[in-house]
Curated annotation (Swiss-Prot):
Its main location: cytoplasm. The keyword Transferase applies. The gene is pdxJ. This is Pyridoxine 5'-phosphate synthase. Catalyzes the complicated ring closure reaction between the two acyclic compounds 1-deoxy-D-xylulose-5-phosphate (DXP) and 3-amino-2-oxopropyl phosphate (1-amino-acetone-3-phosphate or AAP) to form pyridoxine 5'-phosphate (PNP) and inorganic phosphate. Its EC number is 2.6.99.2. It comes from Acinetobacter baylyi (strain ATCC 33305 / BD413 / ADP1). One of its GO terms (cellular component) is cytosol. HAMAP family: PdxJ. Keywords: Cytoplasm, Pyridoxine biosynthesis, Transferase. PANTHER family: PYRIDOXINE 5'-PHOSPHATE SYNTHASE. InterPro entries: Aldolase_TIM (IPR013785), PyrdxlP_synth_PdxJ (IPR004569), Pyridoxine-5'_phos_synth (IPR036130).
């Protein structure tokens, strides 16, 4: 069975915010993605609100027919917002104001008690909590100890590798992380920097449950349309196994 496709629609909002307009509407984009075959919709409400806005999340939540995967920093403000919205899934991610995009995995080891408390708080209101981490065994063990049922492994280093040797080394690290986490009973997702050129080796890993992909799909949609861009990525994922 192929991995599921979660489409991240953040960069529809990026395009809107670039001009301060009301269009394009990320809620409308999410519905198109669902109709095109996406099995979930991912969006990141950043502390600086650089793309997705609170109102986007509120409007989208009751309209989705699949699942909302809301990415958030581990802060009191964001935890309170998630308790209000109650998305099916919450993925805790690291966040730095000066970064262009999320640059690495969450350091669960270094802020264990904080992450554990946040995980338990949202689990108590019915959210399936995942932690966006690097494929590092210590971080995976910490995620387990937090009580998170799901992790999402950061594929950025694989996607950004400049040589074939580097990419293969990163792929092997991801495979080992996936296999270890799955052997411990975790649901394992993956994402960041994935596109049609590099998706196949990741999508071929049998234990990966879902792949969350955004920027490359939105970029491809400029040329082929959003529905077709989603379908192209879904076809590539399905062909990998």
């Amino acid at each position: 069975m192929a991995a599921l496709l979660g489409v991240n629609i953040d960069h529809v909002a990026t395009l809107r915010q670039a001009r301060g307009t009301r269009y394009p509407d990320p809620v409308s984009a999410a519905l198109v993605c669902e109709q095109a075959g996406a099995e979930g919709i991912t969006l990141h409400l950043r502390e600086d609100r650089r793309h997705i806005q609170d109102d986007d999340v509120r409007r989208m939540r009751p309209l989705l027919k699949t699942r909302m995967n809301l990415e958030l920093a581990v802060t009191d403000e964001m935890i309170a917002f998630a308790k209000e919205i109650q998305p099916q899934h919450v993925c805790f991610v690291p966040e730095r104001r000066q970064e262009v995009t999320t640059e690495g995995g969450l350091d669960v080891v270094g802020q264990f008690e904080k992450v554990k408390a946040a995980t338990q708080t949202l689990a108590a209101v019915g959210c399936d909590v995942s932690l966006f981490i690097d494929a590092d065994l210590a971080q995976i063990d910490a995620a387990i100890a937090c009580g998170a049922p799901t992790i999402e492994l950061h594929t950025g280093a694989y996607a950004d590798a400049e040589t074939e040797e580097q990419q293969q080394a990163e792929l092997q690290r991801i495979i080992e992380g996936v296999e270890y986490a799955a052997s411990k009973g975790l649901v394992v997702n993956a994402g960041h920097g994935l596109n049609l050129d590099n998706i196949t080796p990741i999508a071929a890993i049998p234990q990966i449950h879902e792949l969350n992909i955004g920027h490359s799909i939105i970029a491809d949609s400029v040329f082929v349309g959003l529905a077709q861009a989603v379908q192209h990525m879904k076809a590539a994922i399905q062909a990998a196994r």
